[in-house]
Amino acid sequence: MGGGSSNAAAVLVGLAKAWGLAADDERVADVARSLGADVAFFLHGGCALLGGVGEVLQRRLETSRRSVVLVKPAEGVCTAEAYKRFDAAPRPVPQDVLVCDLAATRADDVVLANNLAPAAEALLPELPSIREWLAEQAGSESVLLSGSGSATFALVDTFAGASRIATAATAHGWWARPTSLSGLRAAVVPGR
Protein backbone atom coordinates (compact mmCIF):
# COMPACT_ATOMS: atom_id res chain seq x y z
CA MET A 1 0.00 0.00 0.00
CA GLY A 2 2.22 2.71 -1.31
CA GLY A 3 5.38 1.12 0.07
CA GLY A 4 7.78 2.20 -2.66
CA SER A 5 5.97 5.49 -3.14
CA SER A 6 5.97 6.37 0.55
CA ASN A 7 9.67 5.46 0.71
CA ALA A 8 10.35 7.75 -2.27
CA ALA A 9 8.44 10.57 -0.56
CA ALA A 10 10.44 10.06 2.63
CA VAL A 11 13.70 10.27 0.64
CA LEU A 12 12.46 13.48 -1.02
CA VAL A 13 11.60 15.00 2.36
CA GLY A 14 15.11 14.14 3.58
CA LEU A 15 16.69 15.59 0.44
CA ALA A 16 14.60 18.75 0.76
CA LYS A 17 15.86 19.19 4.30
CA ALA A 18 19.47 18.65 3.17
CA TRP A 19 18.98 21.20 0.37
CA GLY A 20 17.42 23.73 2.74
CA LEU A 21 13.98 23.49 1.09
CA ALA A 22 10.59 23.09 2.71
CA ALA A 23 9.02 19.69 2.03
CA ASP A 24 6.08 21.48 0.39
CA ASP A 25 8.33 23.51 -1.94
CA GLU A 26 7.01 23.32 -5.51
CA ARG A 27 10.37 21.96 -6.74
CA VAL A 28 10.07 19.00 -4.38
CA ALA A 29 6.48 18.48 -5.54
CA ASP A 30 7.64 18.52 -9.19
CA VAL A 31 10.15 15.74 -8.50
CA ALA A 32 7.48 13.77 -6.61
CA ARG A 33 5.05 14.08 -9.52
CA SER A 34 7.72 12.86 -11.92
CA LEU A 35 8.10 9.71 -9.80
CA GLY A 36 4.37 8.97 -9.54
CA ALA A 37 1.06 10.46 -8.46
CA ASP A 38 1.03 8.62 -5.16
CA VAL A 39 4.55 9.86 -4.31
CA ALA A 40 3.14 13.39 -4.32
CA PHE A 41 0.29 12.22 -2.07
CA PHE A 42 2.72 11.01 0.59
CA LEU A 43 4.27 14.48 0.72
CA HIS A 44 0.86 15.70 1.94
CA GLY A 45 -0.23 12.63 3.89
CA GLY A 46 -3.40 12.26 5.87
CA CYS A 47 -6.78 12.13 4.18
CA ALA A 48 -7.19 14.43 1.22
CA LEU A 49 -9.12 15.11 -1.95
CA LEU A 50 -6.67 15.01 -4.84
CA GLY A 51 -7.06 16.18 -8.42
CA GLY A 52 -5.20 15.51 -11.66
CA VAL A 53 -4.06 11.91 -11.65
CA GLY A 54 -3.79 12.08 -7.87
CA GLU A 55 -0.91 14.51 -7.57
CA VAL A 56 -2.74 17.83 -6.99
CA LEU A 57 -3.94 18.52 -3.44
CA GLN A 58 -7.45 20.01 -3.60
CA ARG A 59 -8.16 20.01 0.13
CA ARG A 60 -7.52 18.05 3.28
CA LEU A 61 -10.27 15.99 4.86
CA GLU A 62 -10.83 15.33 8.54
CA THR A 63 -9.22 11.94 9.21
CA SER A 64 -11.50 9.06 10.16
CA ARG A 65 -11.12 7.60 13.63
CA ARG A 66 -12.14 4.14 12.45
CA SER A 67 -9.72 1.25 12.33
CA VAL A 68 -8.69 -0.72 9.27
CA VAL A 69 -7.95 -4.37 8.62
CA LEU A 70 -5.60 -5.21 5.75
CA VAL A 71 -5.67 -8.63 4.10
CA LYS A 72 -3.31 -9.90 1.40
CA PRO A 73 -2.92 -13.21 -0.42
CA ALA A 74 0.51 -14.82 -0.75
CA GLU A 75 0.79 -13.71 -4.38
CA GLY A 76 0.94 -10.13 -5.61
CA VAL A 77 -0.41 -8.26 -8.60
CA CYS A 78 1.89 -6.77 -11.23
CA THR A 79 0.92 -3.09 -11.24
CA ALA A 80 1.94 -2.62 -14.89
CA GLU A 81 -0.27 -5.56 -15.93
CA ALA A 82 -3.22 -4.22 -13.93
CA TYR A 83 -2.94 -0.82 -15.64
CA LYS A 84 -2.53 -2.47 -19.04
CA ARG A 85 -5.73 -4.45 -18.49
CA PHE A 86 -7.51 -1.33 -17.21
CA ASP A 87 -6.38 0.72 -20.22
CA ALA A 88 -7.82 -1.95 -22.54
CA ALA A 89 -11.28 -1.58 -20.94
CA PRO A 90 -11.37 1.52 -18.70
CA ARG A 91 -14.18 1.86 -16.17
CA PRO A 92 -14.87 5.40 -14.97
CA VAL A 93 -15.85 6.01 -11.37
CA PRO A 94 -19.65 6.49 -11.27
CA GLN A 95 -20.74 10.13 -11.48
CA ASP A 96 -22.78 10.00 -8.25
CA VAL A 97 -19.71 8.80 -6.34
CA LEU A 98 -17.64 11.69 -7.70
CA VAL A 99 -20.32 14.25 -6.80
CA CYS A 100 -20.58 12.89 -3.25
CA ASP A 101 -16.81 12.83 -2.79
CA LEU A 102 -16.35 16.37 -4.10
CA ALA A 103 -18.75 17.60 -1.41
CA ALA A 104 -17.07 15.67 1.43
CA THR A 105 -15.18 17.49 4.17
CA ARG A 106 -14.53 14.42 6.33
CA ALA A 107 -12.97 11.12 5.31
CA ASP A 108 -15.99 9.34 6.82
CA ASP A 109 -18.25 11.05 4.25
CA VAL A 110 -16.29 9.80 1.23
CA VAL A 111 -17.77 7.00 -0.87
CA LEU A 112 -14.80 4.74 -1.55
CA ALA A 113 -14.28 3.47 -5.10
CA ASN A 114 -11.46 1.83 -7.02
CA ASN A 115 -12.02 1.56 -10.75
CA LEU A 116 -8.71 -0.32 -11.09
CA ALA A 117 -9.96 -3.17 -8.87
CA PRO A 118 -11.72 -5.21 -11.61
CA ALA A 119 -8.53 -5.28 -13.69
CA ALA A 120 -6.40 -6.33 -10.71
CA GLU A 121 -8.94 -8.91 -9.56
CA ALA A 122 -8.96 -10.47 -13.05
CA LEU A 123 -5.20 -11.01 -12.74
CA LEU A 124 -5.38 -12.66 -9.32
CA PRO A 125 -8.62 -14.65 -8.84
CA GLU A 126 -8.05 -14.97 -5.09
CA LEU A 127 -8.71 -11.23 -4.64
CA PRO A 128 -12.50 -11.39 -5.17
CA SER A 129 -12.65 -14.24 -2.63
CA ILE A 130 -10.83 -12.10 -0.07
CA ARG A 131 -13.10 -9.12 -0.80
CA GLU A 132 -16.24 -11.25 -0.44
CA TRP A 133 -14.95 -12.89 2.75
CA LEU A 134 -14.10 -9.51 4.29
CA ALA A 135 -17.53 -8.12 3.39
CA GLU A 136 -19.15 -11.00 5.32
CA GLN A 137 -17.23 -10.27 8.53
CA ALA A 138 -19.20 -8.64 11.33
CA GLY A 139 -18.31 -4.97 11.67
CA SER A 140 -16.55 -4.61 8.31
CA GLU A 141 -17.55 -1.73 6.03
CA SER A 142 -16.30 -0.21 2.78
CA VAL A 143 -14.37 -3.28 1.66
CA LEU A 144 -12.11 -2.40 -1.25
CA LEU A 145 -8.93 -3.39 -3.03
CA SER A 146 -6.17 -0.85 -2.42
CA GLY A 147 -4.85 0.52 -5.72
CA SER A 148 -3.70 -2.27 -8.01
CA GLY A 149 -3.53 -4.69 -5.09
CA SER A 150 -2.83 -6.99 -3.67
CA ALA A 151 -4.02 -5.66 -0.30
CA THR A 152 -7.76 -5.54 0.34
CA PHE A 153 -8.98 -3.48 3.27
CA ALA A 154 -12.11 -2.97 5.32
CA LEU A 155 -13.00 -0.12 7.63
CA VAL A 156 -13.98 -1.29 11.11
CA ASP A 157 -15.39 0.81 13.97
CA THR A 158 -12.99 -0.54 16.60
CA PHE A 159 -9.40 -1.74 16.70
CA ALA A 160 -10.60 -4.83 18.59
CA GLY A 161 -12.94 -5.61 15.68
CA ALA A 162 -10.15 -5.13 13.15
CA SER A 163 -7.91 -7.41 15.24
CA ARG A 164 -10.59 -10.10 15.38
CA ILE A 165 -11.00 -10.02 11.60
CA ALA A 166 -7.22 -10.09 11.06
CA THR A 167 -6.90 -13.16 13.27
CA ALA A 168 -9.66 -14.91 11.32
CA ALA A 169 -8.00 -13.97 8.01
CA THR A 170 -4.66 -15.46 9.04
CA ALA A 171 -6.49 -18.72 9.78
CA HIS A 172 -7.32 -18.74 6.04
CA GLY A 173 -3.61 -18.48 5.22
CA TRP A 174 -3.70 -14.80 4.30
CA TRP A 175 -1.40 -12.10 5.63
CA ALA A 176 -3.50 -9.71 7.73
CA ARG A 177 -2.95 -6.74 10.03
CA PRO A 178 -5.21 -4.44 12.01
CA THR A 179 -4.21 -0.78 11.89
CA SER A 180 -5.64 2.71 12.11
CA LEU A 181 -5.79 5.72 9.83
CA SER A 182 -3.34 8.54 10.33
CA GLY A 183 -3.04 12.20 9.46
CA LEU A 184 0.75 11.86 9.24
CA ARG A 185 2.91 12.38 6.18
CA ALA A 186 6.47 11.46 5.25
CA ALA A 187 8.86 13.15 7.67
CA VAL A 188 12.48 13.20 8.78
CA VAL A 189 12.90 11.73 12.25
CA PRO A 190 16.03 12.97 14.01
CA GLY A 191 18.60 10.30 14.87
CA ARG A 192 19.51 9.42 18.40
Regions flagged by a language model, labelled:
Residues 1-25:
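DPxDG-like acidic metal-binding loop motif
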Residues 1-2, 34, 43, 50-52, ...:
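Short glycine/serine/threonine-biased micro-segments
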Residues 13, 29-30, 132, 167:
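Active-site phosphate/pyrophosphate- and oxyanion-stabilizing loops and adjacent acidic/basic residues
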Residues 44-142, 157-163, 167, 177-192:
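Conserved, helical-rich catalytic subdomain that frames metal- and/or nucleotide-binding sites
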Residues 146-157:
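N-terminal pre-core extensions flanking Radical SAM catalytic domains
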